[in-house]
């Protein structure tokens, strides 16, 4: 094959780690910061979107600050329930953004790692954490206002990769 296009972020210390695609073709890239300065890692974005205007990082919400203990580490990304979901392992959250980078909010999950869409994502998603798994059905709001979310206790925590075989 041949290279058709190449994309890079301006910050060479942002590592492109995990990918998810929305039905409209937008590609989400979960990021991991490799800065030697802890303050720069903490301030780093979690997500970049590849669309018609190229590859661009997505800012944190209006407050502009990353969640406490973020440490620049996104464990996974998936498309489900109309949202790109990113796991923030050290911050203990699953965070949501739209295909245009609008903040949708967050769901708490200690040690959040693997994210798996249910079906094609239209039915929601599952997230694995260090002590429990979270099942978030269609209509899930990242503010936690919709649901209901089901939580399952885990004998072992899940890492940052997973595939849902059945539910």
What are these regions (language model features)?
Residues 13-20, 68-76, 110-122, 149-167:
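Repeated scaffold domains used in trafficking and secretory/extracellular systems
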Residues 29-30, 86, 126-128:
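Residue position within the beta-strands of beta-propeller blades
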Residues 37-45, 89-90:
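Short, solvent-exposed loop/turn segments at conserved positions within beta-propeller repeat blades
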Residues 1-2, 43-54:
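Beta-propeller blade signature
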Residues 7-12, 60-70, 105-110:
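Surface loop/turn motifs at the tips and blade-to-blade linkers of beta-strand repeat domains
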Residues 32-35, 89, 130-131:
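Short loop/turn segments immediately following the C-termini of beta-strands
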Residues 51-54, 98-100, 139:
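Short loop/turn segments that connect beta-strands within beta-propeller blades
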Residues 24-26, 81-82, 121-123:
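Short coil/turn segments that connect the beta-strands within blades of beta-propeller domains
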């Amino acid at each position: 094959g041949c290279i058709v296009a190449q994309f890079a972020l301006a910050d060479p210390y942002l590592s492109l780690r995990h990918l998810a695609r929305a039905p409209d073709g937008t590609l989400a890239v979960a990021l991991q910061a490799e800065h030697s300065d802890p303050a720069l890692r903490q301030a780093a974005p979690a997500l970049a979107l590849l669309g018609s205007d190229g590859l661009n990082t997505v800012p944190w919400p209006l407050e502009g600050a990353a969640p406490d203990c973020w440490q620049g580490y996104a464990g996974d990304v998936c498309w489900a329930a109309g949202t790109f979901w990113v796991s923030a392992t050290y911050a203990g959250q699953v965070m949501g953004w739209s295909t245009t980078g609008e903040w949708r909010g967050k769901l708490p999950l200690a040690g959040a790692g693997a994210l798996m869409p249910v079906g094609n994502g239209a039915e929601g998603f599952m997230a694995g954490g260090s002590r429990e798994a979270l099942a978030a059905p269609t209509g899930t709001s990242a503010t936690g206002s919709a649901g209901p979310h089901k939580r399952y206790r885990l004998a072992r925590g899940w890492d940052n990769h997973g595939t849902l075989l059945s539910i």
